[in-house]
């Protein structure tokens, strides 16, 4: 699939990421490389995303379930693909739970807190 907006070259993204304190792996991702077409924008957006990801009161497991549900309901293959690994390796979400996010109301894998956040996503 061809991007609708071209990404900046990987080397440029890594250099900009380094200036911002972002590692090469993160700076090499398409989302960063696309936003980096506008360096001022990427600085602000990544500042906001970092704050949301690191200074919130939501457990990482719940956050990733929310992201996976949003990815599923919006048909975002990119979001689903990017966060599958994060959810399974860093947030303690099993592959079975990720698949169950698609039709979570019928699943017995989720407790009350998880069901509440998944319902909030659907609302």
Locate each region found by the language model.
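Short helix-to-loop capping/linker segments positioned immediately adjacent to catalytic or ligand/cofactor-binding
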Residues: 52-56, 73-74, 107-108
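Mobile cap/lid helix-loop segments that border enzyme active or cofactor-binding sites
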Residues: 1-60, 89, 112, 116
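Residues forming well-ordered secondary-structure scaffolds
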Residues: 82, 96, 112, 116-119
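Short, intrinsically disordered/low-complexity patches at protein termini
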Residues: 9-10, 67, 86-87, 120-123
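Short alpha-helical scaffolding segments that buttress acidic/His motifs in well-ordered protein cores
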Residues: 35, 45, 49-52, 65-71, ...
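Conserved alpha-helical segments that form or flank metal/cofactor-binding pockets of metalloenzymes
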Residues: 58, 62-65, 70-98
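Acidic/His metal-coordination segments adjacent to aromatic residues that form catalytic metal sites
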Residues: 101-112
């Amino acid at each position: 699939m061809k991007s609708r907006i071209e990404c900046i070259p990987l080397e440029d993204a890594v250099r900009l990421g380094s200036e911002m304190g972002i590692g090469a792996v993160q700076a090499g991702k398409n989302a960063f490389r696309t936003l980096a077409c506008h360096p001022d924008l990427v600085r602000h957006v990544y500042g906001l995303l970092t704050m949301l990801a690191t200074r919130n009161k939501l457990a990482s497991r719940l956050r990733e379930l929310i992201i996976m549900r949003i990815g599923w309901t919006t048909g975002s293959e990119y979001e689903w693909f990017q966060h599958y690994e994060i959810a399974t390796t860093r947030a303690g979400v099993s592959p079975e739970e990720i698949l169950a996010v698609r039709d979570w109301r019928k699943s017995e894998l989720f407790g009350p807190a998880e069901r509440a956040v998944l319902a909030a996503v659907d609302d």
